[in-house]
């Protein structure tokens, strides 16, 4: 579909801009990625300045606005990137991280989906502060391995590195419509279009399902 080709072309432009600064780029979607700029191609010591430059380059080359989150780990950077959408930069500094997380609703946590957020709500866990009252053992019992991550995240701890060579575990496609689709015929037509695009991408990569 032509629209997918446009998305892909713009995505490639954005990813090329990221690569101008660092090879440590871990894509999350067509237009979003983690970047580790601790050491970077520009010799800059400021991640905030790099984020500003990248935003400006994206606008200059694609005429699209972008938001950025700057912090010392992936969890906090992702949360920060959602704060100033669609066209801002938000920084979570190390000495302010725990206070920020304590006030944050758990449904804003990166990695907490709707089902988990609902379960947390049932348990009286509504904010980072509530989550912090739980022991690592109790969180692990309730949420499994993810519970250990939540225990660390709420304390501003995330040791995951930016994985530029991350193994692809899924394949998808998305499309944005100018108007909401209310009619079932339109929805099914859109799903059929997206399914065909996923099939095309899977064949191209010789994936099987």
PLM features: residue spans?
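Gly/Gly-Pro- and Ser/Thr-rich, intrinsically disordered tail segments characteristic of DNA damage-repair
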Residues: 1-142, 146-148, 162, 200
